[in-house]
Amino acid sequence: MKRENLHQPFEISFSELAESLLKEHEHTFFELVYILSGTGIQWINNNMFPYHDGHLFMITPGDTHSFEIHTTTKFVDIKFNDIYIHSSV
């Protein structure tokens, strides 16, 4: 399984993906995934969560997750790590 790292304290990205399967992977950081549009399934730690417009998911360090994208989906990803949290307190 792929393990992703974040090389800066904070990052925001927008993406649009057509029907596909995004393989299961793990993070060393926090990620907020906001669904702007589209439908599919988000798998988090082997739990299935159908999604559609307006859904928000929080992925924490060590969680595994993947997507089954059923219709073209637009995402907003907000990624941050412990350094960002500690510097904001």
Name what the model sees in each region.
Residues 1-56, 69-71, 83, 89:
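Generic protein-terminus/edge-of-domain signal
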Residues 59:
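Glycine-rich, highly charged phosphate/nucleotide-binding loops
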Residues 62-85:
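Ligand-binding loop in jelly-roll beta-barrel domains
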